[in-house]
């Protein structure tokens, strides 16, 4: 696969989960899909509007008291802990609503999963609301970022102005 990043943005993504024999894939031209085992591929979309209470995915290893208080500002929610790229895929599949990432990641950790979630109608943005982008700085480290499906919710409000740019 050539040219997975165009204009500093992923345009295609593939995430495979060997333990469950599940593959998530998507592109801007063809939307997002999930393939489980030998089943036929199924089209997936982010959930809009977000569920109530919202399902927020995160990592236990990156939890801290400040994050807890920020999440409380979002209102009633269920926090589910899981592995890295799976968080993006749960959003792409419409099984989660928000993923705040305030810990270190590298571009290779996120580009494929971002391609899937954006193909499913989701957004991956930095603290200022601009899209997470690639290959345009000296470091391969990502700034803090947020993944969500429902753009009507004010997901970023509790995190803005708190120096969450890494």
Describe each model-derived feature in a short phrase.
Residues 2-89, 138-166:
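Acidic beta-strand-loop-alpha-helix segment within the catalytic core
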Residues 56, 90-92, 111-118:
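Hydrophobic residues within well-ordered alpha-helices
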Residues 60, 103-105, 127-130:
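Short secondary-structure boundary segments
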Residues 76, 101-102:
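A generic structural signal for short
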Residues 84, 102-103:
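Beta->alpha turn/N-cap motifs
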Residues 93-98, 122-123:
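Alpha-to-beta junction loops
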Residues 108:
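Acidic donor-binding loop at a coil-to-helix junction in glycosyltransferase catalytic cores
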Residues 122-137:
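Acidic, metal-binding active-site segment of PIN/NYN-like and related structure-specific nucleases
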């Amino acid at each position: 696969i050539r040219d997975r990043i165009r204009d500093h943005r992923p345009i295609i993504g593939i995430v495979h989960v060997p333990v469950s024999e599940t593959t998530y894939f998507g592109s801007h031209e063809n939307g997002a899909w999930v393939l489980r085992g030998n089943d036929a591929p199924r089209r997936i979309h982010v959930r809009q509007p977000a569920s109530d209470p919202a399902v927020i995915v995160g990592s236990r290893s990156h939890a801290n008291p400040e994050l807890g208080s920020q999440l409380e500002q979002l209102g009633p929610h269920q926090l589910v802990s899981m592995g890295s790229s799976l968080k993006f895929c749960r959003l792409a599949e419409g099984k989660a609503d928000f993923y705040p990432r305030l810990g270190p990641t590298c571009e290779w950790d996120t580009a494929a999963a971002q391609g899937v979630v954006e193909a499913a109608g989701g957004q991956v943005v930095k603290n200022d609301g601009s899209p997470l982008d690639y290959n345009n700085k000296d470091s391969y480290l990502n700034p803090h970022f947020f993944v969500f499906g429902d753009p009507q919710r004010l997901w970023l409000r509790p995190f803005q102005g708190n120096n969450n740019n890494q």
